[in-house]
């Protein structure tokens, strides 16, 4: 067992953090060697297994990420932008693969990730599931095949606690559509219409976000023309798909050179 890659999970007390830890523990392909929480969390100092309501697993939750990363081969991180860029710098110091599922990253955050990627492997994706990444590739292909007579809209739905919109996955799909069209998403993007908006701008890519209940994640890419419509759809019903994808990325990154990668690289798409 000791020759299996050691994994640290950040944001251990959150829903994704707990799912990630359970996935690593059940995988048989990696070891959970660390769990990180913010200072002041009531999880700090507790056994991670016991904190999740199960048996002790011999991993104590810590608020010292560098010490945890130093004993790991990979860090899996679904937290918040400011925390993620700090973790990226520390993971680079430890030369640990950093798998990032955090969304809502701004250009300034991405600049710091680019620096960290000079020293360590970073795998970052708005969505870690196989199905969504296949949807992304299909979206680009369909956008390549259809002209501007086909309007493109991305509609996403998530649980009421999600704090950013559009979702990272929706933006990933929008980027794929923009690549297919050969345009810059920043110029084509229209988010959340309200009031008197006037006619739809030709070539624009629209985004709409729904928040409610416990929706895990739903994404539709709509290609609409006069008299016909194509809808590409992915529905997530279990967060385990993201955890399994993140673990796959952490294992894949073990043999790679420092740099930035995404799930398309991991899946060979």
Swiss-Prot record:
Principal location listed in the UniProt entry: cytoplasm
InterPro entries: DapB_C, DapB_N, DapB_N_CS, DHDPR_bac, NAD(P)-bd_dom_sf
GO BP terms: diaminopimelate biosynthetic process; lysine biosynthetic process via diaminopimelate
Record key words, sorted: Amino-acid biosynthesis, Cytoplasm, Diaminopimelate biosynthesis, Lysine biosynthesis, NAD, NADP, Oxidoreductase
CDD domains recorded: DHDPR_N (cd02274)
Cellular component GO terms held in the UniProt record: cytosol
Keyword NAD: yes
UniProt binding sites for NAD(+): 11-16, 37, 101-103, 125-128
EC number, UniProt record: 1.17.1.8
Gene3D superfamilies named in the record: Dihydrodipicolinate Reductase, domain 2 (3.30.360.10), NAD(P)-binding Rossmann-like Domain (3.40.50.720)
GO molecular function: 4-hydroxy-tetrahydrodipicolinate reductase; NAD binding; NADP binding; oxidoreductase activity, acting on CH or CH2 groups, NAD or NADP as acceptor
Name the record gives this protein: 4-hydroxy-tetrahydrodipicolinate reductase
Organism: Cereibacter sphaeroides (strain KD131 / KCTC 12085)
Lineage, highest ranks first: Bacteria, Pseudomonadati, Pseudomonadota, Alphaproteobacteria, Rhodobacterales
């Amino acid at each position: 067992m000791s020759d299996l890659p050691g994994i640290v999970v950040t944001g251990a007390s959150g829903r994704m953090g707990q799912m990630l830890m359970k996935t690593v523990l059940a995988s048989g392909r990696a070891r959970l060697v660390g769990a990180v929480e913010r200072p002041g969390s009531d999880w700090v100092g507790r056994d991670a297994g016991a904190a999740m309501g199960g048996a002790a697993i011999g991993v104590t939750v810590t608020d010292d990420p560098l010490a945890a990363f130093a004993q790991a081969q990979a860090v899996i991180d679904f937290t918040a932008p400011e925390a993620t860029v700090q973790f990226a710098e520390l993971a680079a110091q430890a030369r640990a693969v950093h798998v990032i599922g955090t969304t809502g990253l701004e250009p300034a955050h991405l600049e710091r990730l680019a620096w960290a990627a000079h020293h360590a492997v970073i795998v970052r994706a708005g969505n870690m599931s196989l199905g969504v990444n296949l949807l992304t590739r299909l979206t680009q292909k369909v956008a390549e095949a259809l002209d501007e007579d086909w309007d493109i809209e991305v509609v996403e739905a998530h649980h009421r606690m999600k704090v950013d919109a559009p979702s990272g996955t929706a933006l990933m799909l929008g980027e794929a559509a923009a690549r297919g069209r050969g345009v810059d998403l920043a110029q084509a993007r229209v988010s959340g219409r309200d009031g008197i908006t006037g006619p739809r701008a030709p070539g624009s890519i629209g985004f709409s976000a729904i928040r409610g209940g416990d929706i895990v994640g739903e994404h539709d890419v709509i290609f609409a023309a006069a008299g016909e419509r194509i809808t590409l759809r992915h529905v997530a019903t279990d967060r385990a798909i993201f955890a399994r994808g993140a673990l796959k990325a952490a294992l894949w990154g073990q043999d790679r050179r420092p740099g930035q990668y995404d799930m398309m690289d991991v899946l060979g798409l």
